[in-house]
């Protein structure tokens, strides 16, 4: 058997291996032994090793013209050199090598086999086609790919990789080039191979210093994309260097590639060996000869690029010259073809569009300088679309790929021939002129690396310029100390999660794994705030990563966290329901790492209702800022709000809260938002969870900058944290950081995400953590020793192990039944809430003391006049009685805040807390001006809110928590609309104290009353609030007079009781003269009355029927009673619905010893209102009371009828039933 036909050019290697086999059979691999034993001779089937072909050699820059040669000097006798003589120049002529000794040497061994193969090759009738191909596009696109590889996975591609892949594609288009010739059974035969097996000609050094050529095969290349081809190519190369090629690697070559251009050869005709039909030779890359003396500037001006000469040597017996010529033309077209380069860029995950082959465009029409400026602006506005921000480097299935053709130079009528030309750039990068290549390099560095920035949508030019300058200046390299600090934070984040995973297997903790860069990011923002001399950072966040943040950012003791895992409650948590560990809050101090700053850090408690914490945290921050009262620039408490990507895009509370940012009653000087974008929501992918391209696209609607940052680049993450904090301080606006990362585990630690995201978790499983990657980077750069890296992790683990053991040794305390919070706070009984007559007059006079030149609106002036007179003459209505409470509290030095939709005027045109001059639009808040005149820091602040209940109520709740000494009231436009804030009511208002020990004195003012306005303007859902009442969690009231409302508000504000107050306020009663109060009700009546007995009972002994009622229905029943002259009926008003004033009710009932019937009369349907709650609890509290019967509308699914006549009929029937004999 001929080794030449099977192994081609590698036949010499077979001979060498066989000689080794003859000397020592064990010295060759098993495959070779089996082959030689089967063949029994040296010409058995060969095997090959291969080394990497060298890349085509680039020519140097054109050399300057050589100086004329000097005339030869006459030979003279040498003398000692003078000390001052100049040193002689060394000759630039290379020293001539010594010629070998003449003689004759027999050729043996390898070279004998090679010579034999060459003789055999002469039997093949070959022909050669030659083609010069433009190489400019290869230079540009190869550089783009290699830049991307340098920033991501490392490595590079060579020209030979590209040409080899183009060769495979061309063979696929011209399969005849893959054929070969052989003689089988004495007959000429055309061989058509099954696959395209590309042979790489590799020059291997031998032990004796000589070199030998082998050809190794990349098999089945037609099935590969470029990335696969590159991997197979590099595998062959790597194994050839290590001598690890197998016999199979040397066999089956169908076409070969050789690259003499690597040593500067421009054109060669390689030999074709038996068994192959084609061999391609690649020459060096150089400018055409006639331009090799031109300067770079001249070459750029002329648009001259380098060429590469490629030859196709083929077996003329099976391949015709036309086919070979077409083959080379196809290769040339591929190397300048858009789709070929698109395929390579896609396979290599290069986010940019490849450079395109194009003819040079003359500088006519629109000036090219203008086009370059347009390109710069395109990158500023859309460069983020191709930024390398996704650590998984993949496109989510179903998500459309954005169009970023604006970033292609071709879009701007620029071509590759413009890259080295100089253009005016208007100060970009601090220069007036640059080459297009320099411009692209700077633009990509600023806008397309690990940070993608969106800021050009911002309307304010100063903001845009500030951001532009910092982004285009680039990210400064951290110092070695800063790098070690970043690594320390990553170590802490990862070690904490690993420790919990090991010690508490299966317990839910919603780990941060995959997003550990959040810890250095938050630390960076807080550290920057500390350096700015600010007072506090308040954090709001969901449950994912919360434990890690509590420990590594807030500084919560490890022992406390471990105790929670052990089920042991801290002392402060005893009583109440408690909550899961990943809902709890805490606070600590942050010491600036590279400075002297120090700042308080607090984490707000939150429920699992995602994003519900947003408005609450903002309210807390605003309260703290108002308490510090540092003026316009005093927003020294920083809100830092964390989100999940799916929640941020999906939940309406997000834009509701962001919308508050620049409103005067809600501005907190900017919030730093971090979206922890792990690219999944539980099991839902982005294509099913948002219609926006980015989860953060809401932010742009509010004119805020967004920074998308790769979570696997901690240095970029830290820089963005600093930049965002600086922007917030400079411009007082919200700023958004989209931290693109992944979730290592499922939604919780017991979940298996591969069930729903198999492809995503193929990429995640086994992936190196960001800490490991960063450690390798620092080790590779020499910035850290391996010992230091290991010591940090070990010390951190030892610290946690020590605390863990202490907790374990402390022993588990036996769980105890929770006692509740009922006994911790009591209603104040002895507190007097009246004011003096002098203060009452002063409050009334405030509406007369208008600023000079101020005029009331014609419809408001009578209201102001009535308020001045009513404090002496009587007839104080509801709105004025309420304002008297707020104004008197502000007078005493308290901060009173009232906010809601239309609260300044009042939904029903009743309040007029702030008057507006119709001519000048000047505002006048009489009670605030009065409080300010006292000089005791009292304030009465009234704000119209945005049209939101959820965010509005949440903000006011947060405000009441952030400043417990303030009096905070949130008013609904109609009480019905409070259900838009049901999450705040359920999760915070009613249960915050029980779950987290978080107290609040928030007041909810909810207009409620059945006046025929329909099902959405009648009921504040009294039954729902009462259902939430337990353990004294809330005070719920429905006062019937302005004075009692006044006393209730003042009692709530002046007492030490810290619980929310829910008041169902009236609508029709606002102008009901029967419901007005006298001045003495504010000055002489000293307390709130939880129950008001019937004042119109002449003889209690005559009373046979007692009606229990609340709200405006009292006045309708009283009117009917008077009309009918019913002295056998007593109407008792329950003013406080919870806690149930059972003693006062019992006393009232006891005052009617002959009563035979107790009616509970209410406007609301039977299944709503106070009745269901009172039916259940009142008999338990008053065991001996007469049987109680309900009188109300029938049970309904809706709250009220929307038909006025039906409403009137229902009300008449209800009252008639109450007064039945």
From Swiss-Prot:
Active-site annotation: 316 (proton acceptor)
Task: Please list the GO terms describing molecular function.
Answer: dihydrolipoyllysine-residue succinyltransferase activity; magnesium ion binding; oxoglutarate dehydrogenase (succinyl-transferring) activity; thiamine pyrophosphate binding
Upon changing residue 258 to A, the result is: Loss of E2 succinyltransferase activity, but nearly no effect on E1 dehydrogenase activity
| Entry's Gene Ontology BP terms | tricarboxylic acid cycle
Q: Where acetyl-CoA is bound, by residue?
A: 1035, 1051, 1087, 1090, 1144
Q: Which EC number(s) are documented for this chain?
A: 1.2.4.2, 2.3.1.61
**Name of the protein in its database record:** 2-oxoglutarate dehydrogenase E1/E2 component
Q: What organism is this sequence from?
A: Corynebacterium glutamicum (strain ATCC 13032 / DSM 20300 / JCM 1318 / BCRC 11384 / CCUG 27702 / LMG 3730 / NBRC 12168 / NCIMB 10025 / NRRL B-2784 / 534)
């Amino acid at each position: 058997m001929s080794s030449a036909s099977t192994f081609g050019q590698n036949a010499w290697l077979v001979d060498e291996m066989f000689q080794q086999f003859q000397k020592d059979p064990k010295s060759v691999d098993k495959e070779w032994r089996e082959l030689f034993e089967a063949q029994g001779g040296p010409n058995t089937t060969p095997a090959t090793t291969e080394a990497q072909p060298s890349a085509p050699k680039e020519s140097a820059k054109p050399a300057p013209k050589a100086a004329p040669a000097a005339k030869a000097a006459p030979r003279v006798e040498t003398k000692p050199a003078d000390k001052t003589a100049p040193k002689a120049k060394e000759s630039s002529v290379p020293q001539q090598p010594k010629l070998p000794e003449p003689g004759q040497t027999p050729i043996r061994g390898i070279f004998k086999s090679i010579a034999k193969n060459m003789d055999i090759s002469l039997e093949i009738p070959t022909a050669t086609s030659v083609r010069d191909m433009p190489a400019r596009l290869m230079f540009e696109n190869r550089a783009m790919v290699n830049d991307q590889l340098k920033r991501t996975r490392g490595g590079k591609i060579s020209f030979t990789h590209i040409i080899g892949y183009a060769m495979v594609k061309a063979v696929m288009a011209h399969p005849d080039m893959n054929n070969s010739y052989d003689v089988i059974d004495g007959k000429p035969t055309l061989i058509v191979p099954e696959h395209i097996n590309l042979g790489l000609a590799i020059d291997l050094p031998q032990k004796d210093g000589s070199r030998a050529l082998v050809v190794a095969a990349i098999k089945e290349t037609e099935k590969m994309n470029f990335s696969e081809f590159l991997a197979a190519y590099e595998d062959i190369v790597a194994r050839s260097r290590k001598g690890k090629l197998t016999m199979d690697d040397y066999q089956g070559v169908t076409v070969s590639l050789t690259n003499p251009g690597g040593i500067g050869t421009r054109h060669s005709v390689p030999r074709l060996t038996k068994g192959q039909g084609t061999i391609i030779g690649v020459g060096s890359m150089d400018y055409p000869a006639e331009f090799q003396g031109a300067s770079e500037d001249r070459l750029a001006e002329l648009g001259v690029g380098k060429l590469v000469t490629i030859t196709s040597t083929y077996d003329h017996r099976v391949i015709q010259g036309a086919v070979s010529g077409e083959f080379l033309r196809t290769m040339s077209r591929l190397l300048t073809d858009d789709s070929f380069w698109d395929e390579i860029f896609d396979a290599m995950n290069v986010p940019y569009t490849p450079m395109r082959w194009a003819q040079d465009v003359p500088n006519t029409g629109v000036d090219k300088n203008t086009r370059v400026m347009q390109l710069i602006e395109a990158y500023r506005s859309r460069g983020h679309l191709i930024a390398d921000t996704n650590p998984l480097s993949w496109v989510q299935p179903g998500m459309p790929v954005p169009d970023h053709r604006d970033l292609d130079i071709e879009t701007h009528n620029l071509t590759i021939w413009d890259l080295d030309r100089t253009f005016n750039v208007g100060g970009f990068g601090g220069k007036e002129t640059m080459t297009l290549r320099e411009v692209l390099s700077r633009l990509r560095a600023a806008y397309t690396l690990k940070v993608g920035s969106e800021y050009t949508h911002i309307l304010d030019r100063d903001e845009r310029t500030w951001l532009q300058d910092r982004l285009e200046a680039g990210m400064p390299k951290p110092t070695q100390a800063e790098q070690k600090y970043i690594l320390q934070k990553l170590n802490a984040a990862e070690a904490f999660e690993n420790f919990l995973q090991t010690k508490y297997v299966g317990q839910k903790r919603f780990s941060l794994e995959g997003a550990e860069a959040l810890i250095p990011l938050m630390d960076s923002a807080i550290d920057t705030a500390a350096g700015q001399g600010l007072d506090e950072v308040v954090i709001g966040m969901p449950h994912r990563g919360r434990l890690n943040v509590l420990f590594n950012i807030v500084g919560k003791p490890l022992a406390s966290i471990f105790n929670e895992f052990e089920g042991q409650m801290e002392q402060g948590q005893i009583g109440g329901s408690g909550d899961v560990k990943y809902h709890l809050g805490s606070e600590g101090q942050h010491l600036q790492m590279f400075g002297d700053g120090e700042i308080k850090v607090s984490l707000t408690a939150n429920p699992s209702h995602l994003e519900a914490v947003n408005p609450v945290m903002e309210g807390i921050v605003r309260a703290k800022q108002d308490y510090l009262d540092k003026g316009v620039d005093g927003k020294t408490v920083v809100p830092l709000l964390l989100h999940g990507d799916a929640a941020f895009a999906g939940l309406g509370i997000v834009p509701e809260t962001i919308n508050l940012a620049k409103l005067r009653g809600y501005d907190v000087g900017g919030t730093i938002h971090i979206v922890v974008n792990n690219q999944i929501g539980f099991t839902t992918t982005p294509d099913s969870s948002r219609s926006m391209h980015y989860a953060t696209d809401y932010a742009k609607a509010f004119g805020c900058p967004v920074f998308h940052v790769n979570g696997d680049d901690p240095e970029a993450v830290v820089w963005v944290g600093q930049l965002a904090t600086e922007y917030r301080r400079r411009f007082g606006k919200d700023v958004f950081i989209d931290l693109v990362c992944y979730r290592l585990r499922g939604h919780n630690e017991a979940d298996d995400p591969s069930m729903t995201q198999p492809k995503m978790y193929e990429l995640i499983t086994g992936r190196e953590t960001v800490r490991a990657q960063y450690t390798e980077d620092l080790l590779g750069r020499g910035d850290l020793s391996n010992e230091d890296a290991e010591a940090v992790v070990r010390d951190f683990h030892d610290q946690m192990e020590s605390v863990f053991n202490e907790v374990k040794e402390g022993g588990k305390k036996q769980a105890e039944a929770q006692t509740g919070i009922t006994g911790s706070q009591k209603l104040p009984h002895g507190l007097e809430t009246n004011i003096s007559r002098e203060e009452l007059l002063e409050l009334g006079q405030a509406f007369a003391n208008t600023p000079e030149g101020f005029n009331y609106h014609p419809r408001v002036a009578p209201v102001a006049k009535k308020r001045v007179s009513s404090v002496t003459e009587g007839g104080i209505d509801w709105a004025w009685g309420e304002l008297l409470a707020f104004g008197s509290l502000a007078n005493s030095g308290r901060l009173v805040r009232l906010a809601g939709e239309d609260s300044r005027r009042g939904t029903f045109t009743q309040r007029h807390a702030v008057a507006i001059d119709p001519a000048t639009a000047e505002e006048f808040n009489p009670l605030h001006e009065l409080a300010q005149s006292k000089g005791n820091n009292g304030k009465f602040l009234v704000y119209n809110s945005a049209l939101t209940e959820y965010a509005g109520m949440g903000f006011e709740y947060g405000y009441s928590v952030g400043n417990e000494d303030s009096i905070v009231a949130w008013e609904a436009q109609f009480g019905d609309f409070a259900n838009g804030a049901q999450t705040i009511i359920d999760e915070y208002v009613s249960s915050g104290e029980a779950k987290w020990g978080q107290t609040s004195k928030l007041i909810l003012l909810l207009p409620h009353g059945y006046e025929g306005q329909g099902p959405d303007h009648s009921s504040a859902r009294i039954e729902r609030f009462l259902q939430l009442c337990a353990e004294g969690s809330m005070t719920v009231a429905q006062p019937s007079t302005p004075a009692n409302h006044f006393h209730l508000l003042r009692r709530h504000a002046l007492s030490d009781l810290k619980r929310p107050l829910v008041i169902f306020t009236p609508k029709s009663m606002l102008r009901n003269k029967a419901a007005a109060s006298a001045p003495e009700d504010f000055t002489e009546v000293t307390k709130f009355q939880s129950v008001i007995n019937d004042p119109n009972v002449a003889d209690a002994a005559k009373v046979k029927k007692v009606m229990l009622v609340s709200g405006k229905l009292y006045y309708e029943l009283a009117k009917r009673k008077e009309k009918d002259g019913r002295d056998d009926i007593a109407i008792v008003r329950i003013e406080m619905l919870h806690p149930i004033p059972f003693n006062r009710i019992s006393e009232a009932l006891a005052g009617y010893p002959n009563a035979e019937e107790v009616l509970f009369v209410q406007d609301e349907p039977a299944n709503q209102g106070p009745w269901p709650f009172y039916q259940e609890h009142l008999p338990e509290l008053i065991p001996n009371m007469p049987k109680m019967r309900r009188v109300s509308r029938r049970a309904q699914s809706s709250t009220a009828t929307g038909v006025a006549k039906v409403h009137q009929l229902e009300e008449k029937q209800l009252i008639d039933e109450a007064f039945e004999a």
